[in-house]
Design a protein with these regions (language model features):
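C-terminal "cap" of GNAT-fold acetyltransferases
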Residues: 147, 157-158, 166-206
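Conserved acyl-donor/pantetheine-binding loop and adjacent beta-alpha core of acyl/acetyltransferases
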Residues: 31, 43, 47-50, 56-94, ...
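Short loop/turn segments at strand-loop or loop-helix junctions that form parts
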Residues: 67-68, 95, 127-132
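Conserved acetyl-CoA-binding loop-helix of GNAT-fold acetyltransferases
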Residues: 97, 101-119
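Conserved GNAT acetyl-CoA-binding A-motif
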Residues: 117-142
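Short amphipathic alpha-helix that is part of the acyltransferase structural core
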Residues: 1-47, 52-61, 188-189, 199-207
Length: 207
């Protein structure tokens, strides 16, 4: 059994994700052409490596998963409002959360994508976002629509709007300013990136 926390999404862990995600090729397809998930996975692992992350609890149960990789692996991005994604960027395509997952799950998964992409020397990370009306429910924002991110969620990580069309935006996070880390050391990746996006506490005045 795998330990709790974030692990890479590969052929070996792909059966851990939710059943609806295992054969989904929405991002990998375009128009009337439907991609083969297995052939896509083989290409992604040969040209990129791990193509996402999973988050497991202490009992080895899935809490969430995130898919990402070089933008050219996701042709659907060209058809989305505000698309296509940039050629030099990795693209975060979808986030699947199970009901009851805490807010730290989606943040940990995105932090892993930021850290791993930076570790590979990628210029930037991009994602499609949607500006939800104020007071929209958490379920609507994270559990109903899984292929676009709430815009204010990406704000927390410093994503900037590259293009917009209506309420949909293509957002970009430049990775050049983040400290590089040794490849494969996921815990250190997460720690370095988390530190980069955690504000320094303001010292309280002494009484």
């Amino acid at each position: 059994m795998r330990g709790p926390g974030v692990s890479g999404l590969t052929t070996g862990t792909s059966q851990t994700v939710a059943p609806v995600c295992r054969d989904c090729v929405w991002w990998q397809s375009r128009g009337n052409r439907t991609a083969s998930k297995q052939r896509w996975i083989e290409r992604a692992e040969e040209e990129w490596g791990e193509w996402g992350s999973i988050y497991l609890d202490e009992h080895g149960r899935l809490l969430g998963s995130l898919q990402y990789g070089p933008s050219y692996l996701f042709p659907r991005a060209a058809d989305l409002p505000a698309g296509p994604a940039s050629d030099d960027a990795a693209l975060v395509t979808c986030l699947y959360l199970l009901r009851g997952a805490t807010g730290w799950v989606e943040k940990s998964l995105l932090l892993a994508a930021i850290g791993e992409s930076r570790d590979r020397g990628t210029t930037a990370l991009e994602a499609f976002a949607y500006r939800y009306p104020e007071h929209e429910t958490q379920e609507e924002r994270f559990l109903v629509h899984r292929t676009v991110f709430p815009r204010d969620f990406l704000d927390e990580f410093g994503f900037a709007t590259l293009r917009s069309q209506g309420r949909v935006e293509l957002c970009r996070l430049e990775l050049g300013g983040l400290q590089a880390v040794e490849e494969g050391r996921r815990a250190k990746v997460l720690r370095v990136v988390q530190d980069a996006f955690t504000p320094t506490p303001i010292p309280l005045p002494r009484p």
